[in-house]
Swiss-Prot record:
Pfam families on file: SKA2
Any one cellular-component term (Gene Ontology): meiotic spindle
GO BP: attachment of mitotic spindle microtubules to kinetochore; cell division; chromosome segregation; establishment of meiotic spindle orientation; mitotic cell cycle; mitotic metaphase chromosome alignment; mitotic sister chromatid segregation; regulation of microtubule polymerization or depolymerization
Protein's UniProt keywords contain Electron transport: no
Taxonomic superkingdom: Eukaryota
GO molecular function term, any single one: microtubule binding
InterPro entries linked to this entry: Ska2, Ska2_N
Name of the molecule in the record: Spindle and kinetochore-associated protein 2
Compartment(s): Cytoplasm, Cytoskeleton, Spindle; Chromosome, Centromere, Kinetochore
Protein encoded by which gene: SKA2
Summary of subunit composition and partner proteins: Component of the SKA1 complex, composed of SKA1, SKA2 and SKA3. Forms a heterodimer with SKA1; the heterodimer interacting with SKA3. The core SKA1 complex is composed of 2 SKA1-SKA2 heterodimers, each heterodimer interacting with a molecule of the SKA3 homodimer. The core SKA1 complex associates with microtubules and forms oligomeric assemblies. Interacts directly with SKA1. Binds directly to microtubules; but with a much lower affinity than SKA1. May interact with NR3C1; the relevance of such interaction remains unclear in vivo.
Similarity annotation: Belongs to the SKA2 family.
Keywords, comma-separated and alphabetical: Cell cycle, Cell division, Centromere, Chromosome, Cytoplasm, Cytoskeleton, Kinetochore, Microtubule, Mitosis, Phosphoprotein
Summary of the function given for this chain in its UniProt record: Component of the SKA1 complex, a microtubule-binding subcomplex of the outer kinetochore that is essential for proper chromosome segregation. Required for timely anaphase onset during mitosis, when chromosomes undergo bipolar attachment on spindle microtubules leading to silencing of the spindle checkpoint. The SKA1 complex is a direct component of the kinetochore-microtubule interface and directly associates with microtubules as oligomeric assemblies. The complex facilitates the processive movement of microspheres along a microtubule in a depolymerization-coupled manner.
Length: 121
């Protein structure tokens, strides 16, 4: 029984040695065939880091999803309020026969920016 254990132990040592040699050869070939990428990280390490980054992203997404929903609802409420205000102003203008002076350059720019950010209007 002890001889079989020793034999298995030697097999594992040889396998470990073979893996070390394969790793050494791969690193050597990468360095010689692609010297400019020799400073790059090991792909396995990059995958582990990617996994950590993905986990962080999911955490951030979970934290900020309610904020995004609330922001969207706020934007909708603001748009509704602006629409009501614009309608009231138009009604008042019609009732009083009041004409507005043309918009200044700054006012036109502000109106364009507002329409860009609030396309629902």
């Amino acid at each position: 029984m002890e001889a079989e254990v020793d034999k298995l132990e030697l097999m594992f040592q040889k396998a470990e040695s073979d893996l070390d040699y394969i790793q050494y050869r791969l690193e050597y070939e990468i360095k010689t065939n692609h010297p400019d990428s020799a400073s790059e990280k090991n792909p396995v390490t990059l995958l582990k880091e990617l996994s950590v980054i993905k986990s962080r992203y999911q955490t951030l997404y979970a934290r900020f999803k309610p904020v995004a929903v609330e922001q969207k609802e706020s934007k909708s409420r603001i748009c509704a309020t602006v629409k009501k205000t614009m309608n009231m102003i138009q009604k008042l203008q019609k009732q009083t026969d009041l004409e507005l002076s043309p918009l200044t350059k700054e006012e036109k720019t502000a109106a364009e920016q507002f329409k860009f950010h609030m396309p629902d209007l």
